[in-house]
């Protein structure tokens, strides 16, 4: 995050737009929230929340039995590291916002879709065409979204949907942190930017923070992702669910996760 912000500051942006998923699956979530809150006090920022924030808010309101281990260890680590103040701040964010900035036409920002933080937008489906046509319902020609961790610029006529990618966990085969800059001169001009950062320093923090020990194969998969841009955790989940169904075992069984790690060659 700090590498991206340093790069973006050199471009002197008028407004900072944050699309959610600030926490979970990375070390030191409380530290991250503190940083963002302080940053927001000193910059012109708009924050919305993503599905990861929703997980933590739901856990406070309706606790589940998250245990350390590959299935839910990373979630428990995150929840235990956050304070009530952190959760209050995150809960105060909307899941979408129609933004009006002087000198620009309005636009939408969301994490998944304007209605669902966990909506997964695919650019090669009929839904993509339908979502683009729905921009008229919001009175905008531009929507910013996230969730997939895969950057894209989807254009149909004068309608645009832009996903800037991911700062911390890109899964498009790249290892740089990703964000977008959007200029307006009567038309929208988006640019997706990649920024190198110290991957091995970040990988070391998984162990230093305790996240790796508490999340087992999941944490190892996350480190593999930041090193390769491959979504190892999703691949592991698919294998574990298949093995669990075949063998009549719970998906929390660590032997299944270890088998998935071996199949995927997760170190």
Where do the language-model regions lie?
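Acidic, His/Gly-rich catalytic cores of divalent-metal-dependent hydrolytic chemistry
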Residues: 155-164, 168-267
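Metallo-beta-lactamase
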Residues: 70-106
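Active-site-proximal segments of metal-dependent phosphoesterases and phosphodiesterases across multiple
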Residues: 65-69, 105-137
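Glycine-rich phosphate-binding loop signature in dinucleotide/nucleotide-binding domains
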Residues: 8-12, 42, 101-103, 136-139
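Anionic-ligand binding region
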Residues: 128-167, 177
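Active-site neighborhood of phospho(di)ester-bond hydrolases with catalytic His/Asp-centered motifs
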Residues: 16-21, 46-51, 110, 142-149, ...
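Core catalytic region of metal-dependent phosphoesterases/phosphodiesterases
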Residues: 1-84
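Active-site environment of divalent metal-dependent phosphoester hydrolases
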Residues: 24-27, 52-57, 115, 142-155, ...
């Amino acid at each position: 995050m700090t590498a991206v912000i340093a790069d973006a500051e050199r471009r002197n942006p008028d407004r900072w737009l944050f699309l959610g998923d600030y926490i979970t699956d990375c070390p030191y979530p409380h530290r991250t929230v503190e940083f963002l809150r302080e940053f927001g006090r000193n910059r012109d920022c708009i924050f919305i929340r993503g599905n990861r924030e929703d997980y933590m808010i739901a856990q406070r309101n309706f606790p589940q039995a998250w245990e350390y281990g590959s299935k839910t260890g990373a979630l428990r680590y995150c929840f235990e590291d956050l304070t009530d103040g952190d959760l209050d701040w995150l809960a105060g964010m909307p899941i979408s916002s129609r933004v009006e900035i002087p000198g620009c036409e309005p636009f939408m920002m969301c994490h998944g879709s304007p209605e669902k933080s966990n909506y997964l937008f695919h650019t090669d489906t009929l839904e993509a065409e339908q979502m683009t046509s729905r921009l008229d319902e919001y009175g905008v020609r531009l929507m910013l979204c996230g969730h997939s961790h895969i950057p894209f610029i989807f254009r149909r006529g004068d309608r645009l949907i832009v996903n800037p990618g991911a700062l911390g966990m890109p899964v498009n085969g790249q290892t740089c942190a990703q964000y977008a800059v959007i200029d307006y001169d009567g038309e929208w001009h988006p640019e997706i930017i990649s920024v190198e950062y110290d991957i091995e320093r970040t990988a070391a923090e998984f162990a230093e923070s305790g996240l790796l020990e508490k999340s087992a194969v999941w944490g190892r998969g996350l480190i593999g992702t930041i090193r390769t841009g491959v979504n190892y955790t999703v691949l592991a989940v698919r294998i574990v669910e298949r093995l669990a169904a075949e063998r009549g075992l719970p998906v929390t069984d660590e032997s299944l996760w270890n088998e998935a790690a071996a199949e995927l060659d997760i170190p």
